[in-house]
Amino acid sequence: MGIWNDRKLIVNCLPLTESERAQFIRAAKDIPQEFVGDSTQRGSMSWTAAVPEELKAKATAVIGNIAPEECAQCPKLEWLQTWSAGVDKYQRPGILQSGSMLTNATGAYGQSVSEHMFAMMWAIMKNLHIYAASNPNAMWQDAGRAISPNGKTALVIGTGDIGSHFARLCKNVGMTTIGIRRNPAVEAPGVDHMIGFDSLDDVLQYADVIAMSVPST
């Protein structure tokens, strides 16, 4: 154990178990850490945590998505680590003081979110949403022709972690994938053809499926 660093304080707002808290404590080493997250919120994506005023005054780092207006109540804040991939609301002028570092959870959601996207695509192709809506009324009418993804083309707008995961799932069922990103020279797993945003209008006509994974979507 080194010297206890009383000039730093991490306020952790995540809904952690005791064993997870222990892992954060070990990772922080000699920097003190206060846990204010509610473990009963596990399984929900609307995590909220009440940060006491005395901790706001001392916090040099916050882990979690505090309300943007609370950032101004943390005068010593040097680092905000969100649990979300999107951080748009913290990037508005006046939210974080100059010099504060903002990091996100990019890379944590690629598999789970892309699986949800794929499930929605599959449901639409197979008319599952129509059959599900008919179920409570005991209506078993034919919803029309189902579509196979095999041989179809998916246009993936935004090929970061989530977009590239989705492209790989599409490839696994026989789809051709076209990816769009700011720098088309950078390849992404699962993408057959990469183009820039300036070519979007040119390829829309070839897409059977359009999936978006860009900021604020």
Regions found by a protein language model. Name each.
Residues 1-101, 205:
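An N-terminal-biased, well-structured beta-alpha scaffold segment characteristic
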Residues 23, 116-120, 202, 206-209:
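Alpha-helical elements of Rossmann-like donor-binding domains used by nucleotide-donor carbohydrate transfer enzymes
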Residues 26, 119, 123, 168, ...:
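Short, well-ordered alpha-helices that flank and scaffold nucleotide-derived cofactor binding pockets
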Residues 34-36, 103, 178, 195:
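General small-molecule cofactor/ligand-binding pocket signal
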Residues 40-47, 60-64, 134-142, 189-197:
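Short gly/ser/thr-rich secondary-structure transition/capping motifs
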Residues 99-153, 179:
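Phosphate-binding beta-alpha-beta segment of Rossmann-like dinucleotide-binding domains, i.e.
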Residues 145-217:
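Rossmann-like dinucleotide/phosphate-binding beta-alpha-beta segment
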